[in-house]
Amino acid sequence: ISAYYYTKNGIFLGDNHLKNVQQFPEKKYLENFDYDLAIPGDTSRFWVLAQEKINEDRKIKFFKTHNALVKLGNNDFTSRSNSLGGIYIVRDPRNVVDSMSRHFQINHDKALEVMQDKKNFTYDFKKKKDYSDYQFISSWELNYQSWKNNNLLPIKFLKYEDLLSETFFVFKEIIEFINKLTNNKSGFSRE
C-alpha cells in the first residue's frame, strides 16, 4: 500500500516505504502535550488533539495501530474529522496465540491469557515507566468488536490468511476501499 501510494511506479523498495506508515499513538506525536508519562493511558487525553495537529496539512496519511476503537475514560481514540476510515486485519486467534508466544517468549497459556485480558495494553517495554507510546488493546474479542460495531468510521475487514493466499485480490480490495474513502476516481492500476 505504501509503495502504491507513495511511489510513481508502485515498486516497493524496502524499509524506506514502510516509514510512510507510522504508528499511532506514538511519543513523537504527543511531545507537546502535558501528560504524565509514568501513568499508563494518560496520553489518551491528547489522542484527538494530537491527530488534529497531525492533520493540519490536510494530506492523506496512513497509520497503523493496535488500539481498540474505544473511549478511555472520557477520551475518544479518534474522531470522524481526523480519520477517513480504517482497515482491520483479522487474524485467526489460534495463530495469534502462537505468534505472541514466539514474539514475547511466553508459553501458549500465558499468550491466551493476555489475549483474553480486557485491560490489556502495550507500550515500548524497553522504556522504564514511560507509557508515552501506550495503546489500549483490550482483549482480542473486544478489540475486534470495537472496530466491527463502530458507527464512527467505515472499516474494511480483511483476514490475514487471505492476505497470504490471495494477495493480489485482497490488495485490489484495499486500494478500491482507500480510493472510495479519498474520492480517488483513478481506479486500480496493475502497473
Where do the model's predicted regions map?
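PAPS-dependent sulfotransferase catalytic core
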Residues: 190-191
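Inter-helical turn/loop segments and adjacent helix faces that build the functional surface
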Residues: 183-184
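PAPS-dependent sulfotransferase catalytic domain
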Residues: 1-158
